[in-house]
Design a protein with these regions (language model features):
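Bacterial N-terminal signal peptides that target proteins for export
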Residues: 1-9
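Bacterial N-terminal signal peptides
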Residues: 11-20
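Sec-dependent signal peptide cleavage junction
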Residues: 19-30
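Beta-strand-enriched, solvent-exposed domains that form extended recognition/catalytic surfaces
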Residues: 28-140
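N-terminal substrate-binding region of glycoside hydrolase catalytic domains
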Residues: 77, 123, 129-289, 293-301
């Protein structure tokens, strides 16, 4: 190849790199304005989310407003979305209220909210996301926690009732595996969808847990996510079945996984609230989600 041709190719490559760099810089445009969410609370009427929003800095390159976006657990960024839930003028400090939508497909209880600006084409986040910090106010069971009479406890299986009574423990831990509970016989509606649970398994837990409660024994549930061929959406997205894994990480990275996982937890919390006659008023006082979360074989992903 002649020297002039090599030079031309080098120059052409340099031009291409410069153009690419320019586009990259444009795409990664930063703004001088920042925004923050001071608080994110369920309102006193328990039907709104009240969000305190403030901002400061130069609004150059924006339309002079701060927009508020809702992100579900399976959404990592605003992306190309335009469906903001509220907006305020830049530089203002205001509290905006949006519907909580509890009990509907648009339920915002598990969502987080992020402030953004608009440059005429794209919305860009300019502050940290914020979750609701008082979700407990909409819990159906508002009873105070009952402290066990003694710290003496036992991690047991369902067939170890007599051991617990003989040893005089006042605190037991029970394992609950996701795969056991899904099935048929009990229909449960949550946020507009119907989910199906294994009636015989649920009733077995009802009997055991209510028996403990009758003996004034506090119950802690350890909820475990074992592999379920019928419901692969429950396992963290992208995870393959492994012979070396005992349990898997819960999946909230996809919409289907999040919604099913949320419904199972809601069913368990409702069933074992101590106020549900269907479970003979069985009550679980403490919940542990997962086991040894920093150990791969126990929370594989």
């Amino acid at each position: 190849m002649k020297k002039w041709m090599k030079t031309a190719l080098v120059l052409a490559a340099a031009v291409c790199l410069s153009v690419a760099a320019a586009f990259t810089a444009l795409a990664a445009q930063t703004f001088q304005i920042t925004a923050s969410i001071g608080s994110c609370l369920i309102g006193s009427g328990q039907n709104t989310v009240d969000i305190s929003l403030s901002s400061n800095g130069d609004t150059t390159g924006t339309d002079g407003k701060i927009y508020l976006f809702e992100l579900r657990p399976y959404e990592s960024e605003i992306g190309s979305r335009t469906d903001y839930v509220s907006s305020v003028g830049a530089g203002e400090t205001r509290t905006v209220s949006i519907p909580l939508n509890k009990g509907t497909a648009q339920d915002r209880l598990y969502s987080r909210f992020v402030p953004a600006v608009f440059d005429g084409t794209t919305f860009t986040a300019v502050g940290a996301a914020h979750y609701i910090t008082n979700p407990e106010v909409v819990a159906s069971n508002q009873d105070a926690f009952k402290t066990p009479l003694t710290k003496k406890g036992l991690n047991i299986q369902l067939n170890m009732l007599n051991d617990a009574f003989t040893l005089g423990v006042k605190h037991v831990a029970v394992n609950i595996a996701f795969s056991q509970f899904l099935g048929s016989g009990i229909d449960y509606e949550y946020d507009g969808k119907t989910y199906h649970f294994n009636k015989s398994v649920v009733e077995n837990y009802d009997k055991v847990i209510s028996t403990y409660i009758g003996k004034d024994i506090s119950v802690t549930a350890i909820v475990l996510n074992d592999w379920n061929d019928a419901h692969p959406e429950l396992v963290h997205a992208g995870t393959a079945k492994s012979s070396s894994a005992n349990y898997y990480m819960f999946n909230t990275k996809t919409q289907e996984g999040f919604e099913t996982t949320r419904a199972i937890f809601a069913f368990l919390a409702d069933r074992y609230s101590g106020k549900n006659h269907n479970s003979n008023y069985a009550k679980i006082s403490n919940w542990i989600l997962g086991n040894e979360i920093n150990n791969q074989i126990w929370n594989y992903m």
